[in-house]
Amino acid sequence: MLFNEFGNKNNPPVLLLHGMMQDWHSEYEMLKPLEAYYRLIIPAQDGFYDGSGDFTSFADQARQIEEYIHQHYDGKIHGAYGASQGGLMLTELLTRNKVDLGTVIMDGCYVAHQGKLSAKVTAWMFKKYKNTGKFPAFIHIMMTLMGTSLEEMADGLTAGMYMNASDETVDRNFLENYTYRTRPEIAHNQTMVHLWCGSKEPYAIKSHNILKKYLPNFDEEIMEGFGHGEFLMKHTADCCEKIYSTFG
Protein backbone atom coordinates (compact mmCIF):
# COMPACT_ATOMS: atom_id res chain seq x y z
CA MET A 1 0.00 0.00 0.00
CA LEU A 2 1.11 3.54 -0.74
CA PHE A 3 0.26 6.07 1.97
CA ASN A 4 -0.02 9.73 0.98
CA GLU A 5 -0.48 12.59 3.44
CA PHE A 6 -1.48 16.21 2.87
CA GLY A 7 -2.24 19.22 5.03
CA ASN A 8 -0.94 20.64 8.29
CA LYS A 9 0.53 17.97 10.56
CA ASN A 10 -1.04 19.71 13.55
CA ASN A 11 -4.57 19.26 12.19
CA PRO A 12 -6.74 16.26 13.17
CA PRO A 13 -5.92 13.19 11.02
CA VAL A 14 -8.63 11.95 8.67
CA LEU A 15 -8.50 8.79 6.54
CA LEU A 16 -9.89 8.97 2.97
CA LEU A 17 -10.42 5.67 1.12
CA HIS A 18 -10.90 5.54 -2.66
CA GLY A 19 -13.41 3.48 -4.58
CA MET A 20 -13.05 0.36 -6.70
CA MET A 21 -10.62 0.65 -9.62
CA GLN A 22 -10.03 4.30 -8.76
CA ASP A 23 -6.77 6.24 -8.86
CA TRP A 24 -6.15 7.80 -5.44
CA HIS A 25 -5.19 11.10 -7.15
CA SER A 26 -8.78 11.65 -8.32
CA GLU A 27 -10.12 11.34 -4.77
CA TYR A 28 -7.47 13.73 -3.49
CA GLU A 29 -8.35 16.35 -6.11
CA MET A 30 -12.03 16.19 -5.17
CA LEU A 31 -11.49 16.28 -1.41
CA LYS A 32 -8.51 18.65 -1.40
CA PRO A 33 -10.52 21.48 0.28
CA LEU A 34 -10.53 19.37 3.46
CA GLU A 35 -6.79 20.08 3.76
CA ALA A 36 -7.74 23.39 5.35
CA TYR A 37 -9.10 21.52 8.39
CA TYR A 38 -7.45 18.09 8.54
CA ARG A 39 -4.30 16.13 7.98
CA LEU A 40 -5.43 13.94 5.07
CA ILE A 41 -4.28 10.32 4.93
CA ILE A 42 -5.00 8.80 1.51
CA PRO A 43 -3.87 5.20 0.97
CA ALA A 44 -3.63 3.72 -2.51
CA GLN A 45 -4.66 0.07 -2.49
CA ASP A 46 -2.21 -2.53 -3.69
CA GLY A 47 -2.55 -2.98 -7.43
CA PHE A 48 -3.77 0.59 -8.02
CA TYR A 49 -0.65 2.73 -8.09
CA ASP A 50 2.51 2.72 -10.19
CA GLY A 51 5.13 0.21 -9.05
CA SER A 52 2.69 -1.75 -6.91
CA GLY A 53 2.27 -5.49 -6.73
CA ASP A 54 -1.13 -7.04 -7.39
CA PHE A 55 -4.16 -6.52 -5.17
CA THR A 56 -4.23 -9.00 -2.30
CA SER A 57 -7.37 -8.98 -0.14
CA PHE A 58 -9.45 -6.57 1.92
CA ALA A 59 -8.15 -8.20 5.10
CA ASP A 60 -4.56 -7.56 4.02
CA GLN A 61 -5.32 -3.98 2.98
CA ALA A 62 -7.00 -3.39 6.36
CA ARG A 63 -3.98 -4.83 8.17
CA GLN A 64 -1.67 -2.38 6.41
CA ILE A 65 -3.92 0.57 7.30
CA GLU A 66 -4.06 -0.54 10.93
CA GLU A 67 -0.29 -0.83 11.13
CA TYR A 68 0.13 2.63 9.61
CA ILE A 69 -2.34 4.26 12.02
CA HIS A 70 -0.68 2.58 15.01
CA GLN A 71 2.79 3.56 13.84
CA HIS A 72 2.01 7.18 12.97
CA TYR A 73 -1.06 8.09 15.05
CA ASP A 74 -0.95 5.81 18.11
CA GLY A 75 -3.90 3.83 16.79
CA LYS A 76 -6.40 6.68 16.76
CA ILE A 77 -7.61 9.16 14.12
CA HIS A 78 -10.30 11.85 14.02
CA GLY A 79 -12.45 10.44 11.23
CA ALA A 80 -12.65 8.26 8.13
CA TYR A 81 -14.52 8.70 4.84
CA GLY A 82 -14.90 5.93 2.29
CA ALA A 83 -16.64 6.20 -1.08
CA SER A 84 -18.06 3.08 -2.76
CA GLN A 85 -15.49 0.33 -2.14
CA GLY A 86 -13.90 2.67 0.38
CA GLY A 87 -17.02 2.06 2.45
CA LEU A 88 -16.45 -1.68 2.22
CA MET A 89 -12.88 -1.14 3.45
CA LEU A 90 -14.29 0.81 6.41
CA THR A 91 -16.67 -2.09 7.09
CA GLU A 92 -13.67 -4.42 7.28
CA LEU A 93 -11.74 -2.03 9.56
CA LEU A 94 -14.74 -1.61 11.86
CA THR A 95 -15.21 -5.38 12.03
CA ARG A 96 -11.56 -6.00 12.90
CA ASN A 97 -11.80 -3.20 15.50
CA LYS A 98 -8.04 -2.74 15.91
CA VAL A 99 -7.90 1.05 15.46
CA ASP A 100 -10.05 3.95 16.65
CA LEU A 101 -11.48 5.56 13.50
CA GLY A 102 -13.26 8.41 15.28
CA THR A 103 -16.34 9.27 13.21
CA VAL A 104 -16.99 7.21 10.06
CA ILE A 105 -18.77 8.17 6.83
CA MET A 106 -19.66 5.51 4.25
CA ASP A 107 -20.75 7.15 0.99
CA GLY A 108 -22.36 4.71 -1.45
CA CYS A 109 -21.01 1.67 0.39
CA TYR A 110 -21.42 -1.69 -1.39
CA VAL A 111 -21.41 -4.76 0.86
CA ALA A 112 -24.38 -6.52 -0.76
CA HIS A 113 -23.14 -9.99 -1.72
CA GLN A 114 -23.43 -10.43 -5.50
CA GLY A 115 -21.60 -13.72 -6.02
CA LYS A 116 -18.70 -15.15 -8.01
CA LEU A 117 -20.46 -15.20 -11.39
CA SER A 118 -21.31 -11.49 -11.19
CA ALA A 119 -17.72 -10.81 -10.14
CA LYS A 120 -16.30 -12.65 -13.14
CA VAL A 121 -18.65 -10.99 -15.63
CA THR A 122 -18.10 -7.48 -14.26
CA ALA A 123 -14.33 -7.97 -14.05
CA TRP A 124 -14.36 -9.05 -17.71
CA MET A 125 -16.27 -5.89 -18.67
CA PHE A 126 -13.82 -3.63 -16.85
CA LYS A 127 -10.79 -5.45 -18.28
CA LYS A 128 -12.26 -4.95 -21.74
CA TYR A 129 -12.61 -1.22 -21.04
CA LYS A 130 -9.13 -1.01 -19.53
CA ASN A 131 -7.51 -2.80 -22.45
CA THR A 132 -9.60 -1.43 -25.36
CA GLY A 133 -11.29 1.74 -24.11
CA LYS A 134 -14.74 0.24 -24.78
CA PHE A 135 -17.36 -1.46 -22.61
CA PRO A 136 -19.52 -4.35 -23.93
CA ALA A 137 -23.10 -3.38 -24.78
CA PHE A 138 -24.74 -4.97 -21.73
CA ILE A 139 -22.76 -2.71 -19.37
CA HIS A 140 -25.97 -0.63 -19.37
CA ILE A 141 -27.68 -3.28 -17.21
CA MET A 142 -25.02 -2.97 -14.53
CA MET A 143 -25.11 0.82 -14.74
CA THR A 144 -28.87 0.81 -14.12
CA LEU A 145 -28.43 -1.34 -11.02
CA MET A 146 -25.71 1.00 -9.75
CA GLY A 147 -27.95 4.01 -10.29
CA THR A 148 -25.89 5.62 -13.02
CA SER A 149 -25.44 5.61 -16.80
CA LEU A 150 -22.55 5.08 -19.16
CA GLU A 151 -22.52 8.81 -19.90
CA GLU A 152 -22.30 9.63 -16.18
CA MET A 153 -19.63 6.97 -15.78
CA ALA A 154 -17.55 8.67 -18.45
CA ASP A 155 -17.94 12.01 -16.67
CA GLY A 156 -16.72 10.70 -13.34
CA LEU A 157 -16.10 7.07 -12.43
CA THR A 158 -14.20 5.98 -15.53
CA ALA A 159 -12.34 9.30 -15.75
CA GLY A 160 -10.86 8.55 -12.32
CA MET A 161 -9.99 4.91 -12.99
CA TYR A 162 -6.45 3.61 -12.52
CA MET A 163 -5.83 2.23 -15.99
CA ASN A 164 -2.56 0.41 -15.28
CA ALA A 165 -4.04 -2.24 -12.99
CA SER A 166 -3.13 -5.77 -14.08
CA ASP A 167 -5.82 -8.22 -15.16
CA GLU A 168 -4.97 -10.30 -12.07
CA THR A 169 -5.60 -7.29 -9.82
CA VAL A 170 -8.95 -6.59 -11.50
CA ASP A 171 -10.04 -10.23 -11.13
CA ARG A 172 -9.05 -10.42 -7.46
CA ASN A 173 -10.56 -7.06 -6.56
CA PHE A 174 -13.94 -7.81 -8.12
CA LEU A 175 -14.04 -11.30 -6.60
CA GLU A 176 -13.25 -9.94 -3.11
CA ASN A 177 -15.80 -7.15 -3.50
CA TYR A 178 -18.67 -9.17 -4.94
CA THR A 179 -18.30 -12.05 -2.46
CA TYR A 180 -17.76 -9.92 0.67
CA ARG A 181 -20.10 -10.61 3.56
CA THR A 182 -20.61 -8.35 6.57
CA ARG A 183 -19.64 -10.24 9.71
CA PRO A 184 -21.60 -10.08 12.99
CA GLU A 185 -18.48 -9.01 14.94
CA ILE A 186 -18.94 -5.48 13.60
CA ALA A 187 -21.68 -5.14 16.24
CA HIS A 188 -18.96 -4.94 18.93
CA ASN A 189 -17.70 -1.63 17.50
CA GLN A 190 -19.29 1.45 19.08
CA THR A 191 -18.04 3.90 16.41
CA MET A 192 -20.61 6.36 15.06
CA VAL A 193 -21.20 5.50 11.40
CA HIS A 194 -22.95 7.82 8.93
CA LEU A 195 -24.48 5.95 5.98
CA TRP A 196 -24.91 8.13 2.88
CA CYS A 197 -26.14 7.19 -0.57
CA GLY A 198 -28.41 8.35 -3.37
CA SER A 199 -32.02 7.27 -3.85
CA LYS A 200 -30.98 5.79 -7.23
CA GLU A 201 -28.47 3.37 -5.65
CA PRO A 202 -30.31 0.07 -5.04
CA TYR A 203 -27.14 -1.84 -4.10
CA ALA A 204 -26.06 0.83 -1.61
CA ILE A 205 -29.54 0.90 -0.03
CA LYS A 206 -29.45 -2.90 0.22
CA SER A 207 -26.00 -2.59 1.82
CA HIS A 208 -27.37 -0.08 4.34
CA ASN A 209 -30.07 -2.56 5.32
CA ILE A 210 -27.41 -5.20 5.97
CA LEU A 211 -25.21 -2.85 8.01
CA LYS A 212 -28.13 -1.54 10.06
CA LYS A 213 -28.74 -5.05 11.39
CA TYR A 214 -25.39 -4.91 13.17
CA LEU A 215 -24.17 -1.35 13.72
CA PRO A 216 -25.01 -0.15 17.25
CA ASN A 217 -24.50 3.54 16.39
CA PHE A 218 -25.47 4.88 12.98
CA ASP A 219 -27.56 7.35 11.08
CA GLU A 220 -28.70 7.11 7.48
CA GLU A 221 -29.21 9.72 4.80
CA ILE A 222 -30.56 8.84 1.37
CA MET A 223 -30.15 11.77 -1.00
CA GLU A 224 -33.08 12.14 -3.35
CA GLY A 225 -32.32 11.82 -7.06
CA PHE A 226 -28.62 10.96 -6.73
CA GLY A 227 -26.90 7.98 -8.34
CA HIS A 228 -23.67 6.22 -7.42
CA GLY A 229 -20.84 8.64 -6.67
CA GLU A 230 -22.87 11.61 -7.85
CA PHE A 231 -22.76 13.64 -4.62
CA LEU A 232 -18.96 13.40 -4.42
CA MET A 233 -18.21 13.88 -8.12
CA LYS A 234 -20.84 16.40 -9.21
CA HIS A 235 -21.40 18.31 -5.96
CA THR A 236 -17.86 18.22 -4.65
CA ALA A 237 -17.94 21.49 -2.70
CA ASP A 238 -21.18 20.47 -0.96
CA CYS A 239 -19.74 17.04 -0.22
CA CYS A 240 -16.60 18.53 1.37
CA GLU A 241 -18.72 20.90 3.45
CA LYS A 242 -20.93 18.02 4.60
CA ILE A 243 -17.92 15.90 5.54
CA TYR A 244 -16.50 18.80 7.56
CA SER A 245 -19.78 19.45 9.37
CA THR A 246 -20.05 15.73 10.19
CA PHE A 247 -16.50 15.28 11.45
CA GLY A 248 -16.31 18.68 13.17
Q: Whereabouts are the PLM-identified features?
A:
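Conserved HGGG/HGGXW glycine-rich cap/lid loop of the alpha/beta-hydrolase fold
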Residues: 4-50
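Short beta-strand/loop motif that positions the catalytic acidic residue
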Residues: 189, 195-197
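Gly/Ala-rich beta-loop-alpha elbow adjacent to hydrolase catalytic centers
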Residues: 82-90
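Conserved alpha/beta-hydrolase catalytic His-Asp/Glu region
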Residues: 115-117, 133-187
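Acidic catalytic loop of the alpha/beta-hydrolase fold
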Residues: 199-204, 229
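Flexible "cap/lid" loop of the alpha/beta hydrolase fold
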Residues: 95-96, 101-132
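Active-site loop/oxyanion-hole signature of alpha/beta-hydrolase fold enzymes
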Residues: 41-79
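Catalytic histidine-centered segment of alpha/beta-hydrolase-like enzymes
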Residues: 226-236
